[in-house]
Amino acid sequence: MAEFSADLCLFDLDGTIVSTTVAAEKAWTKLCYEYGVDPSELFKHSHGARTQEVLRRFFPKLDDTDNKGVLALEKDIAHSYLDTVSLIPGAENLLLSLDVDTETQKKLPERKWAIVTSGSPYLAFSWFETILKNVGKPKVFITGFDVKNGKPDPEGYSRARDLLRQDLQLTGKQDLKYVVFEDAPVGIKAGKAMGAITVGITSSYDKSVLFDAGADYVVCDLTQVSVVKNNENGIVIQVNNPLTRA
């Protein structure tokens, strides 16, 4: 068991909160066959990357003017393969627990967590209208369309951090601590580059890959992560039976 404190929590979405790997791979494979691209080669580079970056790299002839290529693919993921999408175990409970003061059991006035995803707004927002409806979309929500540089660049996480600090009136507070939850090496690297504690989830990659990327803790899923204290002074997070390199 391990415990650490944090002021703000930042979450990746696909593979961290929502299990979308099967849906995404089916949609990408379909597109690969249409354009004669080797899916296995694409999958070496697609996870955690922005859709528009993958399209530019592997489908240079596809028309992505005004992101219409991105939207077409991600609508396919959201609708054609919705039956393969599920929540990462423990995700809903963890997010809901971050909304409650552990001392008073009352809902906090402002959320201390945000989403930072490489996906498009259409796809990312859709999960909060379906399988994450009970949680509801957070105010601070950074998508792949909101940043110039995708992960492993820390731009997305840094932007979410700054917006949360502004919303929570923490801009003048020094030595704030942050935690990033991620399933992809590029996301772990982005979190570390921002100076955050990083928790890797092995939904998409082996634990060794996440440790090599710099993960401070690695878990199988979010049932191993719980909030033991949450109030105006910060958050204390407990990681139960974290995985080890051995």
From Swiss-Prot:
UniProt keyword list: Hydrolase, Magnesium, Metal-binding
InterPro entries: HAD-like_sf (IPR036412), HAD-like_SPP (IPR051806), HAD-SF_hydro_IA (IPR006439), HAD_sf (IPR023214), PGP-like_dom2 (IPR023198)
Entry's pH dependence statement: Optimum pH is 6.
A single BP term in Gene Ontology: glucose metabolic process
Further facts: Present with 752 molecules/cell in log phase SD medium.
UniProt-annotated binding residues for substrate: 83, 92, 146-149
Keyword DNA repair: no
NCBIfam families documented for this protein: HAD-SF-IA-v3
Highest rank taxon of the organism: Eukaryota
Pfam family, one: Hydrolase
Described purpose of this protein according to its UniProt entry: Phosphatase that is active on 2-deoxy-D-glucose 6-phosphate (2-DOG-6P), as well as on fructose-1-P.
Family matches, as CDD domains: HAD_ScGPP-like
Protein family according to the UniProt entry: Belongs to the HAD-like hydrolase superfamily. DOG/GPP family.
Designated name of the protein: 2-deoxyglucose-6-phosphate phosphatase 1
Needed co-factor(s): Mg(2+)
Reaction catalyzed: 2-deoxy-D-glucose 6-phosphate + H2O = 2-deoxy-D-glucose + phosphate
Any one GO molecular-function label of the UniProt entry: 2-deoxyglucose-6-phosphatase activity
Top class in the EC scheme: hydrolase
Matches recorded under PANTHER family: 2-DEOXYGLUCOSE-6-PHOSPHATE PHOSPHATASE 1-RELATED (PTHR43481:SF9), FRUCTOSE-1-PHOSPHATE PHOSPHATASE (PTHR43481)
EC number: 3.1.3.68
TM region positions: none
Active site: 83 (nucleophile)
Temperature dependence: Optimum temperature is 30 degrees Celsius.
Gene (UniProt): DOG1
Binding site for Mg(2+): 83, 183
